[in-house]
Amino acid sequence: PISGASISFPETTTLNFQSGIAEDTLLYGAIHQGKWSTAQIIVPENPNGINPATGAADALVSPIGSSFDDKIHYSIGVGRKVSDELALSISYAREDGGGALTSDPFTFRNGYDTYSVSARYTASENVTISAGYTYTTAGDVKVVHEAAPGVPSGLTLDYTDNSVSGFGFKIGYSF
């Protein structure tokens, strides 16, 4: 543990909605706001010269702090009951970025776009099979390390052309 370190959590508000737009078709979505500007991570300067990550003697470790911005996340999707056995859905989600250049060491993306598809098949009265796929592209960001507040150290991290894919599969049995 580091003496004087602190972390706080954001105040959040979420508005979910859904509405039938045709027989067996559902439109759904959400707006999620996080007040991240009031929820920061702060690690103070380490005056004893011991690197808390390695436990080894080190030069004076600079203070580290986040500079999170307030964020709004939007999502929208459509679900369709194709038959008594099969239901499908597709959705899209987006969060705008806070800028392509930052000194915040906790920032690894500049917004994102997410695309998802899923299906649920009722094989029998007791068995369901569900599967889903999600693809997310993260916005590019360059993190510039500061040796002291406002003084670049020359160390930069480039997070570019990043994406993540996820797949889920479930077999459900009820009795």
Model-identified regions with their sequence ranges:
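Outer-membrane beta-barrel porins/channels
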Residues: 1-175
